Amino acid sequence: MIASKFGIGQQVRHKLLGYLGVIIDIDPEYSLEKPTLDEITKNDTLRKSPWYHVVMEDEEGKPMHTYLAEVQLGYENILTHPEQTTLDELSESIRLQLQTPRLRN
């Protein structure tokens, strides 16, 4: 079993670029495309660690979906971001959905 450092709905920062993001899904290992044999031997450690689907905002404030390795992300300790309220709202909405049980008919 692979343990992930971050959870769905959690706000994170891109370590290199500093962008704020919200995790919307987690893959236990890289899963966008099937790697070639050469790629497997070169990047096996990176591919076998968790990868995250993260929503971030571009320079114009438009949401964008990114796929990032765990090593590219850092914790975000600040809960509110006046300059990026939509990401705060997305994070809160996801966390509430995960905490609130749904009634199914």
Curated annotation (Swiss-Prot):
It is found in: Cytoplasm. It comes from the Bacteria. Keywords: Cytoplasm, Stress response. Gene3D superfamilies: Hemimethylated DNA-binding domain. GO terms for cellular component: cytoplasm. Belongs to the HspQ family. HAMAP family: HspQ. NCBIfam families: PRK14129.1 (NF010729), yccV (TIGR02097). Involved in the degradation of certain denaturated proteins, including DnaA, during heat shock stress. This is Heat shock protein HspQ. The gene is hspQ.
